[in-house]
C-alpha cells in the first residue's frame, strides 16, 4: 500500500510522468521477455473438437512479487504480439512499482499463433478466428498461469490492458470474465462504433477535424483532391501517375479510386498516430505528424510547388519511395475495414474480423469531411465479405454479444480516449458509472497513454496516466478484501 | 406501479399465495400457447458456418400490455419445452398481474429443436450442443422479439426464469447478457456444484437427510440395502430377481449394480420432487412422496412383510410394473449424470451435457449416506465420456466460463433453494450481495416455487414467491429509469 501512495505522491507532485524508462520510441529500453507457448483448444465451444494449436505468449517476471504483485495482462490484438510489447511502455513504466507479473498473450490467427500455419486463412480454416474464441484463450491461459505461478485472487489480481481493438478486448474480458479479470484499462477502444452504433461518416470527419487544427491545411487538402478529381474527369491518368510518381501507372477509374484510397489512408494514419515524438508504430513518422504534414503542404504551395506535387510530398511523409516511386498497390490494399488495410497474414485476419464481429464501415462524403466521395456502407460491406470470405455478415451479433451501449452493469473499466484520435467519438467519453470511468486526453492520439513516458508527453497524457493508476490501485485494493482463493 | 403495490398488499396481507389458477398439477388450467419457430445459426461462434436450424418457442401474449408489460422469459432446459410450460405455473400466476409477454424458447437438441433430426446425437453432430450456443440462441431470439413486438428496455424489461439447469441458464444469462436480461429468478440452480466445486458425496447425503426426517426410515433402508448386499455376496441373484419382480432376471455383479442404481434412483426422484401435492413432473408421485414412501416401508415391515419385498414396494411408488414386473433397464439407464438418467433423445443430450459443461459427479459411500458404495469420480466420468461421446472432459472450463464461486460482480439474480431439495447445497444459500439474493424455502423440494400456487403449498413457499415478486418489481422499476431504447 505504502508503495502505491509513494507512487501517487510522485505523480501528483511533479506530474512529470514516470521516468523509469525513457526513449521508448526506439525500443532501446524495452524490457526483455520470455517467449512461451501454450496449447489451446481450437474450438472452446465445441467439445467434440479436440484439436489444439500453439498460442504464443510473452512473459516478464523480473519484478514480480508473488506475495502481493498483480498480473498485468495485455489483451493481444490484431498483430504480432512483439510489436505490442514494443509499443505499450506504460505497462513497463509501472510494472516495477507494482511488482507485477507481465503477460502478453498473442491473439489467435496473428503473428506466430496460427492454428493452421500459412493455410490458416483458407475459407475452411478461418472460422475459428473469433472474438469469443480469443477471449476464451485468454481466460484459459490466465487460469493456467495462476496455477503455474501459484497466484490467488487476493494477492495477485489480474489487470487487463489493451489499446484499440486490444482495448475492446480488455473491456470485453471484464464484461464476460470478471471472475478472472479484476479491472481493465481500455485505451482508445471504440466499443460503440465497432458494435455498429456510430454513423459511417464519423471517423473521417474526425480525421478532418484533426487537420483542421492546423491553419490553412484543410482548404489545401480539398484543393488537392479537387485537382485530382479534375484530372481524373478529363481522363488524364497520366498526369496523376506522374505527379504521384506511381511505380505502376494508373489508367482507369479503378486505379484512380485506389490512388484516392492510398492518399486518404496517409491522412488516416497520421491522425491516428499524431504523437508528440517520432514513432514507428504504424509507419515511421516524425513528431506531431499532422502538424508536420500540414506545415509542409502550406510551405510547399507557398514556395510555388504545384498542388499535386505538394500532395505527393505529403504522402511521402508516411510512404516509402525507396524505388524512387510509390507502389500504391503494395502500400494500400482494399479491404473490409477502410481504415486499416495492409499486406500479409495479419491483414488477412483483420479483414476477416472486419467482416464478422467488428463493424468498421467508414466512408467519406466531401461535406462533413475533406475527402472525395468514397462510399462504403453495410450493403457494400456485405458484398465484399461474401465475396472475399464467404461469410454473410451477422449485423446484429456484435451488439447482442458485446452489449452495445448497454454496459452499465459492467464495473472496473477505464475507457481512455485522446481527442486527437479519430476513433475517440466511437467510445464512451463520459463516466458511465462510478466504476466505468472515462479518461479524456486532450492532446492524445490513438492510445498515447499506453505508450511509455516520454519527455515530450503533453500534460494531458500525464494526468490521464495518473488517473489510470489511481483506478488500478483501487481495483487492487478491492481484491485485497477477498480471501486468498484460486480463480 | 399501483398494480404492483396492490399485488404486494394482497400477498403480504393474506400470504395465501396467488390463486388465479388452481389445480396446476393436472395442467387443467395451464394457459394456452402459440407454437412458433425461429431460424437460429447452428454455430453462433463460427461465422463461416451458415447452417441454421429451427428452434421452437412458445408464446402467450393474451395479457401483454406493450406500454409497460415486461417479458417473462423461461430459459428452456433439458427437455421438451411443453413439459416446462406445464410445470412452471408461477409465471402464469403472476403474468396477468404484470401484463407480461410470456416466452418459452426450447433448448437446442431437446424436444423438437433438433438441428439434425434424429441423427442430432451422432458424434459428428452433437458438438453444437453447448451452454454457450444455447445462451446465444436465447439472446438472439429475445432481440428478434423486441423488434417483432416493438419492445423497449424501459417499458418491457426482460425477466428470466428457470428451474434446475434452467435456473442455471437464467443466472448465466444475467452474467453474460445483462444487456438483454434485466433480472433472473434462478430456482434450485446448483451453480457451484455443476461447476465442479462441490464434494461428490454431497447430493446423496442430502437425499439421505430428507429420508432421515421420517422416523425409522433410514435404518430400514440401510437394512434393505444390506439384505441386497448379502444376497449378492452369496451369488443369490435369483432371490433378488424374484423379490424385485424383475422382468429380466439379473445374473451377475453388473446386473446387481444396475438394480442398485435403479433402486437408488427411486430415492433420488422422490427427494427431488417431494412436493406437498400429487404431481407428475419426474414420474407420477403422491403428495409428499418421501413421507409416503417411508411410512409404507415402516408399515410393510411392521406387518411382517420381508425387507426386500417392502423395498420393492417402495420402488413401485415411482416405477410402473404394468407388465407385472419391473424393467430396470428401461426405467434406469446408466449415464454420465447418476442423478438423472433416462430413455430417449432428451436423455442422450443431457448425457452429452453432463460430459461437457455440467459437472455432475455424485457418488455414494454408505457412511455419509444410506446407500451402498457406488463410486463415481472424475476419472470414471472421463472414461465414460470418452467412450460414449468421444469427448475429453475439459474439467476446468465450466468454472472459467461460468465464474465458479466468483459471481459477486453479477446483479439482479434471485437464487432460490428448497431445503428438501437434495441439490440445495450446490448453490448460494445466503445473499452474495444486495442484488444477488438467496431465498430459502424450508419445506420446498426442487424448484417448488416455480410451480403454480396450490392450496397445499406450505407457508415457506408462499413467502418465497412474495420475496421473488418483490425483486422482480425492483428490477422492473430499475428499468423504468432508463430511456426507451432498443436492446
Predicted regions and their residues:
Chain A
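Small-residue-rich helix-loop
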Residues: 322, 329-398
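Alpha/beta-hydrolase fold nucleophile elbow
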Residues: 151-165
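Short beta-strand/loop motif that positions the catalytic acidic residue
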Residues: 409, 415-417
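Glycine-rich "HGGG/HGxG" loop immediately N-terminal to the catalytic nucleophile
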Residues: 109-124, 449
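Alpha/beta-hydrolase active-site loop
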Residues: 125-149
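Catalytic-loop region of hydrolases
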Residues: 2-101, 112, 121, 420, ...
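Alpha/beta-hydrolase
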Residues: 163, 169-351
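Conserved alpha/beta-hydrolase "acid-adjacent" motif
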Residues: 417-418, 422-427
Amino acid at each position: 500500500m505504502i508503495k502505491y501512495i509513494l507512487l501517487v505522491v510522485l505523480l501528483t507532485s511533479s506530474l512529470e510522468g514516470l521516468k523509469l524508462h525513457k526513449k521508448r520510441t526506439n525500443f532501446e529500453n524495452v524490457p526483455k521477455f520470455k517467449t512461451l507457448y501454450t496449447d489451446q483448444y481450437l474450438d472452446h465451444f465445441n467439445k467434440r473438437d479436440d484439436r489444439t494449436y500453439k498460442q504464443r505468449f510473452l512473459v516478464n517476471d523480473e519484478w514480480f512479487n508473488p506475495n502481493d504483485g498483480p498480473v498485468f495482462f495485455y489483451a493481444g490484438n490484431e498483430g504480432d504480439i512483439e510489436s505490442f510489447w514494443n509499443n505499450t511502455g506504460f505497462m513497463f513504466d509501472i510494472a516495477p512499482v507494482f511488482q507485477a507479473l507481465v503477460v502478453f498473450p498473442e491473439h489467435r490467427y496473428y503473428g506466430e499463433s496460427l492454428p493452421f500455419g500459412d493455410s490458416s486463412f483458407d475459407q475452411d480454416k478461418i472460422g475459428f478466428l473469433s472474438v469469443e474464441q480469443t477471449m476464451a484463450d485468454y481466460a484459459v491461459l490466465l487460469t493456467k498461469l495462476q496455477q503455474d505461478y501459484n497466484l490467488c485472487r487476493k494477492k495477485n489480481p489480474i489487470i487487463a490492458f489493451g489499446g484499440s481493438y486490444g482495448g475492446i478486448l480488455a473491456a470485453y474480458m471484464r464484461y464476460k470474465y470478471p471472475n478472472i479479470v479484476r479491472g481493465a484499462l481500455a485505451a482508445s477502444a471504440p466499443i460503440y462504433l465497432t458494435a455498429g452504433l456510430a454513423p459511417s461518416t464519423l471517423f473521417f470527419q474526425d480525421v478532418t477535424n484533426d487537420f483542421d487544427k492546423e491553419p490553412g491545411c484543410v482548404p489545401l487538402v480539398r484543393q488537392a483532391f479537387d485537382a485530382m478529381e479534375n484530372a481524373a474527369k478529363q481522363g488524364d491518368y497520366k498526369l496523376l501517375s506522374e505527379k504521384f510518381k506511381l511505380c505502376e501507372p494508373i489508367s482507369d477509374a479503378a486505379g484512380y479510386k485506389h490512388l484516392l484510397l492510398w492518399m486518404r489512408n496517409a491522412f488516416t494514419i497520421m491522425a491516428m498516430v499524431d504523437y508528440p515524438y517520432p514513432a514507428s508504430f504504424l509507419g515511421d513518422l516524425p513528431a506531431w505528424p499532422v502538424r508536420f504534414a500540414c506545415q509542409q503542404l502550406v510551405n510547399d504551395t507557398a514556395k510555388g510547388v504545384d498542388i499535386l506535387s505538394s500532395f505527393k510530398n505529403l504522402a511521402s511523409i508516411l510512404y516509402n519511395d525507396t524505388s524512387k516511386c510509390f507502389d500504391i498497390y503494395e502500400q494500400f490494399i482494399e479491404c473490409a475495414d477502410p481504415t486499416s488495410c495492409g499486406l500479409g497474414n495479419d491483414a488477412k485476419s483483420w479483414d476477416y474480423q472486419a467482416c464478422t464481429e467488428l463493424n468498421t464501415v467508414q466512408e467519406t462524403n466531401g461535406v462533413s469531411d475533406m475527402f472525395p466521395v468514397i462510399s462504403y456502407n453495410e450493403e457494400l460491406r456485405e458484398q465484399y465479405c461474401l465475396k472475399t470470405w464467404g461469410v454473410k455478415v451477422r449485423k446484429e451479433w456484435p451488439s447482442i454479444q458485446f452489449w452495445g451501449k448497454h454496459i452499465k452493469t459492467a464495473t472496473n473499466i477505464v475507457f481512455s480516449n485522446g481527442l486527437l484520435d479519430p476513433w475517440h467519438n466511437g467510445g464512451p467519453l463520459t463516466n458511465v458509472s462510478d466504476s466505468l470511468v472515462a479518461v479524456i486526453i486532450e492532446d492524445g492520439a490513438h492510445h498515447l497513454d499506453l505508450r511509455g513516458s516520454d519527455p515530450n508527453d503533453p500534460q494531458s497524457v500525464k494526468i490521464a496516466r495518473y488517473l489510470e493508476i489511481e483506478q488500478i490501485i483501487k481495483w487492487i485494493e478491492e481484491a485485497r478484501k477477498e480471501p486468498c482463493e484460486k480463480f
